[in-house]
């Protein structure tokens, strides 16, 4: 798994516990889970492209010709 062994994962876990403390870990895990879920949802949904003609950046085609 990405070249990381069990020993490295344990060291990272201990460092996270020391830095954030045991009380903050559920909040961090929940936030990370929500972020991953939202990322997966965003990548699986089709892109929404606005194809309506007309205004573009607050200007109309007529304004572009005059400039």
Curated annotation (Swiss-Prot):
Q: Where are the transmembrane segments?
A: 1-21
The record's Pfam families line, in alphabetical order, gives: TatA_B_E
Q: Which domain of life is it from?
A: Bacteria
Which GO BP terms apply?
Answer: protein transport by the Tat complex
Cell membrane as a keyword of this entry, yes or no, is yes
Subcellular location(s) per record:
Cell inner membrane
One term of GO molecular function: protein transmembrane transporter activity
* Membrane in keyword set: yes
Instruction: Please state which protein family the record places this protein in.
Output: Belongs to the TatA/E family.
Q: What is this protein called?
A: Sec-independent protein translocase protein TatA
Taxonomic lineage is: Bacteria, Pseudomonadati, Thermodesulfobacteriota, Desulfovibrionia, Desulfovibrionales
């Amino acid at each position: 798994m990405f070249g990381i062994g069990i020993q490295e994962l344990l060291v990272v876990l201990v460092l996270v516990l020391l830095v954030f403390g045991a009380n903050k870990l559920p909040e961090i895990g929940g936030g990370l889970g929500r972020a991953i879920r939202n990322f997966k949802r965003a990548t699986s949904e089709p892109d929404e492209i606005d194809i309506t003609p007309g205004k573009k950046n607050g200007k109309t085609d007529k304004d572009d010709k005059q400039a």
